[in-house]
């Protein structure tokens, strides 16, 4: 049997936790504009599985690619990197 390939990981900020055991994570990346050369911020949202419902809005989390869990969920929360400050 062959070894499993290294899974993709991303670090992003939780933008929504309204769903049961699911959070929406916004991952920001910087790309260079193909024509003008300027660095542009690009944000992509991922739905990620949060088994313990531990994530709050504003938390910085690490997510890892996994098998499809639903129509749109293919990521899971690995760890909370930084908790949000509640004011």
From Swiss-Prot:
Originating species: Heliobacterium modesticaldum (strain ATCC 51547 / Ice1)
Role played: One of the primary rRNA binding proteins, it binds specifically to the 5'-end of 16S ribosomal RNA.
Protein's recorded name: Small ribosomal subunit protein uS17
UniProt superkingdom: Bacteria
Oligomeric form and interacting partners: Part of the 30S ribosomal subunit.
PROSITE patterns for this protein: RIBOSOMAL_S17
Alphabetical GO biological process terms: translation
Classification via Gene3D superfamilies: Nucleic acid-binding proteins
HAMAP family the record matches: Ribosomal_uS17_B
Gene Ontology terms, MF aspect: rRNA binding; structural constituent of ribosome
GO CC list: cytosolic small ribosomal subunit
Pfam families referenced in this protein's UniProt entry, alphabetically: Ribosomal_S17
Family recorded in the similarity comment: Belongs to the universal ribosomal protein uS17 family.
InterPro entries to which the protein is assigned, alphabetical: NA-bd_OB-fold, Ribosomal_uS17, Ribosomal_uS17_bact/chlr, Ribosomal_uS17_CS
Record keywords, A-Z: Ribonucleoprotein, Ribosomal protein, RNA-binding, rRNA-binding
């Amino acid at each position: 049997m062959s070894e499993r390939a290294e899974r993709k990981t991303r670090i992003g900020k939780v933008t929504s936790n309204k769903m049961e055991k699911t959070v929406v994570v916004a991952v920001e990346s910087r790309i260079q504009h193909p024509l003008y050369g300027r660095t542009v911020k690009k944000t992509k949202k991922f739905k990620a599985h949060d088994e313990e419902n531990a994530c709050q809005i504003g938390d910085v989390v690490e997510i890892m690619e996994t098998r499809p869990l639903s129509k749109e969920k293919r990521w899971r929360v690995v760890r909370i990197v930084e908790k949000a400050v509640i004011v």
